């Protein structure tokens, strides 16, 4: 890949998990961002231990050579919470803009089971036509609000939500306007479909509307257990569903090849939530960085 096209970041979820705060509760913000920099990353997303004061956060990141590239935002358009979502989005947008980010990664969390004990494969929400209409209207509005600050809105397809499968990604992309984008996540698509082919098909199909990339690997044996025992998304996380690139079943070279073929310019972010007591965050950050350097050449 062309180094000038790619910026490489890592998410703090490997140090402290926002959905399971007890995972990594002992890890401090300063430790997290210092280890990111030591491992060779120049950007990150935002975790629950990050200072929310822009000046304070900027200083702590600047001295480490780290910048914010995105932060998760939950939308609830399908549930009818349009105005509340928009008001919260404006605050989120303004924070990210002040931090220099260009992309806002959103997830439609209406009826999501990702934070519950429900079986992630059998009990995920299914949206009807009215749901999709509400979602499209909401995301089209977010795109306009993001554009006011020169930013782009992207949707993060995610296990346990109404936009998980390739078919649901297709529906999302067909109902929203062209100025609404996609956050591609290798791990969530592989997890959902259980194969590399389906994941790569989504990447290539929508490459021109992908504005942010999450790199996460998957442990097949854990996914098999999640399916066999009807486990929840978070139970899978604790058992080790996800890991850094190069440590699981996904072959990332075809991903990098597609991104290079279509001249993708932007961030690739290692986002691999694990139990830090079992997978030392710094060591795994180094492992992922080494693999990306060797396979992608960046």
Swiss-Prot record:
Any one GO molecular function term:
myo-inosose-2 dehydratase activity
Which reaction does this enzyme catalyse, per its entry?
scyllo-inosose = 3D-3,5/4-trihydroxycyclohexane-1,2-dione + H2O
Top EC group: lyase
Q: Where are the transmembrane segments?
A: none
Keywords on this record?
A: Cobalt, Lyase, Manganese
Q: What is its EC number?
A: 4.2.1.44
Q: Name one GO biological process term.
A: inositol catabolic process
Task: Give the signal sequence positions.
Answer: none
Check the record and name the Pfam families matching this protein. AP_endonuc_2
Cofactors that this protein relies on: glutathione; Co(2+); Mn(2+)
Keyword Zinc annotated = no
Q: Which family does it belong to?
A: Belongs to the IolE/MocC family.
Q: Which PANTHER family has this protein been placed in?
A: HYDROXYPYRUVATE ISOMERASE (PTHR12110), INOSOSE DEHYDRATASE (PTHR12110:SF41)
* NCBIfam families in the cross-refs: myo_inos_iolE
Which HAMAP family does UniProt cross-reference here?
IolE
The protein here is known as Inosose dehydratase
Q: Which organism is it from?
A: Glaesserella parasuis serovar 5 (strain SH0165)
Question: Species lineage, top-down?
Answer: Bacteria, Pseudomonadati, Pseudomonadota, Gammaproteobacteria, Pasteurellales
Q: Which gene encodes it?
A: iolE
